């Protein structure tokens, strides 16, 4: 689970940015922007996309419950198409991408409304628009991994060179209400495809399952856990989506569902594994009161 904070040399500091909690049914988000009008744009888009998804699930209830890849990628609604592509790429059900996909739609709506910075945290699945060309600085996203040894840490993510929306998504088998068939403390994915980041985080968390450690020494537990971490990371490293459909915003790089795993982190207890391009670790004040959750 992660939580956002931000630094910005342009003067739009964390104190000046607006942070608002919003809940609609199961969707519980934290929205960050420089102006309240962009917050409203995100809320409207969340309601719109939830309605599209609910109508589709009403017509085909199995879509909302299956844990397996969806065999046919629908052309519309777009939220369902993107969720299906992401779930299929990760080898799991399409609902594994719901939080990240909704977050990415909300951020795209904020950008269309004129936002120069936008962030939506949907229960640890975060979509971000933070380009350097808009005067933005680095963003610090904290890590909350329950009772693991990795406390008061975060990632310092530099502003993007391109005007894109990217994802930082987290799954946990020990923290939060989301479904996980593993018991990792935190499985974190970085990707320019937010839906893929969400599904891949779920798949990575599922891939780490440890049991029967009662009779092992501490050294044996550590060695076994590290091997399981490495195995799980190897299972997800080649996930990718290649989508040729023109993006709905008319600006494909901004809000594309296409992407690969740019980086991944898996944490269990005092053990950690990292692959790919992962931002710098920094000390962070990870406050429970600002982590996105039901109230």
Locations of the language-model features?
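Short acidic-hydrophobic catalytic motif
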Residues: 2, 44, 188
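RNase III-family endoribonuclease catalytic core
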Residues: 102-139
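Ligand-binding beta-strand-loop-alpha-helix segment within the catalytic cores
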Residues: 74-97, 106-115
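N-terminal low-complexity or amphipathic/hydrophobic leaders
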Residues: 13, 21-84
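Short, Gly/Pro- and small/polar-rich lid/capping loops
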Residues: 1-9
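Short amphipathic alpha-helical segments
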Residues: 38-45, 49, 98, 102, ...
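A structural signal for small-residue-enriched, beta-sheet-centric alpha/beta enzyme cores
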Residues: 14-36, 140-295
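General beta-strand structural signal in soluble alpha/beta enzymes
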Residues: 93-99, 116-122, 128, 143, ...
């Amino acid at each position: 689970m992660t939580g956002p904070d931000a630094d910005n040399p342009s003067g739009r500091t964390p104190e000046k940015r607006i942070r608002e909690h919003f809940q609609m049914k199961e969707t519980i988000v934290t929205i960050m922007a420089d102006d309240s009008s962009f917050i409203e744009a995100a809320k409207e888009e969340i309601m719109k996309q939830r309605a599209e998804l609910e109508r589709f699930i009403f017509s085909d209830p199995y879509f909302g419950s299956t844990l397996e890849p969806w065999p046919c990628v629908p052309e519309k609604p777009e939220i369902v198409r993107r969720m299906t592509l992401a779930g299929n790429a990760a080898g799991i059900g399409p609902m594994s991408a719901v939080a990240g996909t909704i977050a990415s739609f909300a951020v795209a709506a904020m950008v269309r409304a004129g936002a120069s910075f936008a962030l939506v945290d949907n229960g640890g699945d975060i979509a971000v628009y933070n380009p350097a060309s808009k005067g933005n600085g680095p963003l610090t996203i904290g890590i909350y991994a329950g009772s693991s040894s990795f406390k008061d840490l975060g990632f310092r993510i530099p502003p993007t060179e391109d005007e894109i929306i990217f994802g930082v998504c987290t799954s946990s088998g020990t923290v939060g209400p989301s479904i996980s068939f593993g018991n990792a403390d935190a499985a974190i994915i970085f990707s320019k495809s937010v839906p893929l980041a969400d599904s891949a985080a779920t798949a990575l968390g599922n891939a780490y399952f440890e049991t029967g450690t009662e009779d092992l020494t501490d050294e044996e537990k550590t060695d076994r856990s590290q091997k399981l971490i490495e195995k799980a990371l190897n299972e997800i490293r080649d996930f990718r989506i290649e989508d040729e459909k023109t993006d709905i915003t008319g600006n494909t790089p901004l809000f594309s569902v296409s992407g690969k795993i740019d980086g991944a982190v898996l944490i269990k207890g005092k053990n950690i594994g990292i692959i790919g391009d992962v931002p710098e670790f920094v000390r962070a004040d990870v406050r429970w009161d600002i982590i996105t959750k039901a109230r």
